[in-house]
Amino acid sequence: MSLIEFLFGRKQKTATVARDRLQIIIAQERAQEGQAPDYLPTLRKELMEVLSKYVNVSLDNIRISQEKQDGMDVLELNITLPEQKKV
């Protein structure tokens, strides 16, 4: 062991770091199964604000739903757009 390795330690290989991070993510997802993500209400609100900023649409015409399909969370966004005026 060289003096530099002793003082600063060895760097972990990127594959090891990536594996450790993935294991943490998987453990968190398993712990949260059956729960809606805590960011979902904020995400819904912000999506509605952005959509209403760029498209003249009523908030009543925007539907956001979250469900599980095949073990994955699916966020579905349905917007009823107003008809465009023909020139």
UniProtKB/Swiss-Prot annotation:
Transmembrane intervals: none
Protein name, UniProt field: Cell division topological specificity factor
Coiled-coil parts of chain: none
UniProt xrefs under InterPro entries: MinE (IPR005527), MinE_sf (IPR036707)
Assigned keywords, A-Z: Cell cycle, Cell division
Purpose: Prevents the cell division inhibition by proteins MinC and MinD at internal division sites while permitting inhibition at polar sites. This ensures cell division at the proper site by restricting the formation of a division septum at the midpoint of the long axis of the cell.
GO BP term, pick one: regulation of division septum assembly
NCBIfam families, A to Z: minE, PRK00296.1, PRK13989.1
Assigned protein family: Belongs to the MinE family.
Lineage: Bacteria, Pseudomonadati, Pseudomonadota, Betaproteobacteria, Neisseriales
CC terms in the record's Gene Ontology section: plasma membrane
Cited SUPFAM superfamilies: Cell division protein MinE topological specificity domain
Cystine crosslinks: none
Gene it is expressed from: minE
The keyword Transmembrane helix is assigned to this record: no
